[in-house]
UniProtKB/Swiss-Prot annotation:
Pathway: Cofactor biosynthesis; thiamine diphosphate biosynthesis. Zn(2+) binds at residues 277, 341. The lineage of its organism: Bacteria, Pseudomonadati, Myxococcota, Myxococcia, Myxococcales. The keyword Hydrolase does not apply. This is Phosphomethylpyrimidine synthase. NCBIfam families: PRK09284.1, PRK13352.1, thiC. GO terms for molecular function: 4 iron, 4 sulfur cluster binding; carbon-carbon lyase activity; zinc ion binding. It comes from Anaeromyxobacter sp. (strain K).
């Protein structure tokens, strides 16, 4: 859908949405997301210009349907897919992408670390109408025997190749600096970010500063030529509750704020990644800290997980934290699956993670009174009161699961219009009883008030 929009920008040195927004231009992408978000196009332009909203939309990704990530937009969720060094299957990753699209992921990240990484990414990009993100350091590592052998030139080459292929946003771990590494020494779990650990290993081996940091200006030049959005990686994020909100985390966050403003000087869009594992009571403070240090750039958080004791259920432990984070200003939530800390997610894990995070994001949108956020809740509630089971399934986040649960005990089609479920049966359904009471009260009022020539009162039931 974007081919004609993109064609008009050929030959321009900076094609980023921020550049156009600061020039006073409402791009087609801005107008498109304004309609999706029920916002005025001028407000979208102003938010992109200010840096509080990003529209990840590489000009080499014409298949993309643009979306907005920012405090004035609905909360978005990201789903991670991609192979590991021990499993490599393009068809399986495309199947995961289809699950992401079916269940409503807003963006997807290809975190492949093995096999033909560019080929896998190309297949995902060409099949994806949603923004695609990557972590370039993973592909960089595939080109060398040891992380110490990485060169800034190779890293820039890989970044440019991914940008030219159409990647919409990239996680760049530029805030992990040499001086910060000792700050993580006291932690229970140390450095848990793969990208953060790799950069720390490189710096210690080469006795040099992080090349993503020293070559940040060159990365900005690449990004503005393709309109790639920075997702500034939190390489020192806490990996357990005990490590949350420590000196290492906040030293890096301050550096990410400085890098955010440097990218903005180039007219490049930025979002900032956040923790991690954080006790529930510390989440609001963490959101406020990011706004303060990073000049209100959109915050993209992984969870956070609010307890460490539930392997196999970390889609739940993290969705709890994600809902609180989103209520307090997080713009995008990176999903966590039941396989977190245990292994590579399969398709069922992907589905469960997406649904858990759609719930978290939606709950936050309702709490923040986003335009139209509660419409679907109200429609489903009306269908529930009317015993319209098929409408309830249709309106649910996961219609297949909702229908399957109902079918477990009442599988026949006749029960899809029954005024009860298997929990209460026909005699104990509270809504059915209330409906009969409402009808009786209305009939009594009509008879009494009709005889007296008065308007009916009594028990009122909304449709």
């Amino acid at each position: 859908m974007r081919a004609d929009w993109i064609a008009k920008r050929r030959g321009q040195a900076n094609v980023s949405q921020m550049h156009y927004a600061r020039s006073g231009v409402v791009t087609e992408e801005m107008a498109f997301v304004a309609a999706r978000e029920r916002l005025e196009p001028e407000l979208v332009r102003a938010e992109v210009a200010r840096g509080r909203m990003v529209i990840p939309a590489n000009v080499r990704h014409p298949e993309l349907e643009p979306l907005a990530i920012g405090i004035t937009a609905c909360c978005k969720i990201n789903a991670n897919i991609g192979n590991s060094a021990v499993t490599s299957n393009i068809d399986e990753e495309l199947a995961k992408l289809r699950v992401c699209l079916k269940y409503g992921a807003d963006t997807v990240m290809d975190l492949s670390t093995g096999g033909d990484i560019p080929q896998i990414r190309e297949a995902i990009l060409r099949a994806s109408p949603i923004p695609v993100g990557t972590v370039p350091i993973y592909e960089c590592l595939a080109h060398v025997k040891d992380v110490a052998d990485l060169t800034p030139e190779l890293m820039l080459e890989i970044i440019e190749a991914q940008a030219a292929q159409g990647v919409d946003y990239m996680t760049i771990h530029a805030g992990v600096l040499r001086d910060f590494i000792p700050l993580a020494a006291h932690r229970i779990t140390g450095i848990v970010s793969r990208g953060g650990a790799l950069m720390a290993q490189w710096m210690l081996a080469n006795k040099a500063e992080n090349p993503f940091f020293t070559h940040f200006e060159q990365i900005c030049e690449i990004f503005k030529r393709y309109d790639v959005t920075f997702s500034l990686g939190d390489g020192l994020r806490p990996g357990c509750l005990a490590d949350a909100s420590d000196a290492a985390q906040f030293a890096e966050l301050k550096a990410l704020g400085d890098l955010t403003r440097k990218a903005w000087e180039h007219g490049v869009q930025v979002m900032v990644e956040g923790p991690g594992h954080v006790p529930l009571d510390q989440i609001p403070m963490n959101m406020e800290k990011e706004r303060e240090l990073c000049s209100e750039a959109p915050f993209y958080v992984l969870g956070p997980l609010v307890t460490d004791i539930a392997p196999g259920y970390d889609h739940i432990t993290s969705a709890i934290g994600a809902a609180v984070a989103a209520q307090h200003g997080a713009a995008m939530l990176c999903y966590v699956t039941p396989a977190e800390h245990l292994g590579l997610p399969d398709i069922d894990d992907v589905r469960e993670g997406i649904v858990a995070y759609k719930i978290a994001a939606h709950a936050a949108d309702v709490a923040r009174h986003r335009p139209g956020a509660r419409d679907r809740d109200d429609a489903l509630s009306r269908a529930r009161y009317a015993f319209d089971w098929n409408k309830q399934f249709e309106l649910s986040l996961d219609p297949d699961t909702a229908r399957a649960k109902h079918d477990e005990t009442l599988p026949h089609e006749a029960f899809k219009s029954a005024e009860f479920c298997s929990m209460c049966g026909p005699k104990f359904c509270s809504m059915k009883i209330h409906g009969h009471l409402a009808e009786a009260a209305a009939a009594q009022d009509a008879a009494a008030n009709g005889a007296a020539g008065k308007p009916a009162g009594g028990l009122q039931v909304l449709p």
